[in-house]
């Protein structure tokens, strides 16, 4: 926003911006409106808009019931969008205990777990397993980074699903994976995955 708005206009515009993108941080909103973070927090409270973590949780709760292949609590991160058999988005904020002590870089298996659980979540099947994973860690993830993962089902052939997952931190790709998942029939889990 180029010019500072008066409070009434700022409150109206803040509501519009958060409705458009509920994942704005208070810092991002403060920068957008050229005010302090404290002002944004007070404005949010006045409008009855919860903090980011609560907004993400509310959106995620609406999506967990759609997942078939795993239980919602098994998903790494908050599932904020899901279209079964097509695509999904999750947000994950690693905690300090997930990082290496010396470098403060998040351990790779947490990043992979977010991608894997999202890939399994988008599959329109009662049970699914990763058969093949081709992954690439592109940049280190640090404490305080917010990971946004997007999964897309590229192709389905028989009981095989081809899913691409991209994870970004502030629009910078930090991880990508191409997964081949096999949906398992509930009465026969002995089938070969690949």
UniProtKB/Swiss-Prot annotation:
Which keywords fit this entry according to its UniProt record?
DNA-binding, Fatty acid biosynthesis, Fatty acid metabolism, Lipid biosynthesis, Lipid metabolism, Repressor, Transcription, Transcription regulation
- Organism equals Thermoanaerobacterium thermosaccharolyticum (strain ATCC 7956 / DSM 571 / NCIMB 9385 / NCA 3814 / NCTC 13789 / WDCM 00135 / 2032) (Clostridium thermosaccharolyticum)
User: Which GO MF term does the entry hold, naming one?
Assistant: DNA-binding transcription factor activity
Classification from the root reads: Bacteria, Bacillati, Bacillota, Clostridia, Thermoanaerobacterales
Query: What's this protein's family per the entry?
Result: Belongs to the FapR family.
List the protein's name: Transcription factor FapR
Function field: Transcriptional factor involved in regulation of membrane lipid biosynthesis by repressing genes involved in fatty acid and phospholipid metabolism.
Classification via HAMAP family: Transcrip_fact_FapR
Write down the superkingdom of origin. Bacteria
Q: Does the keyword Repressor apply?
A: yes
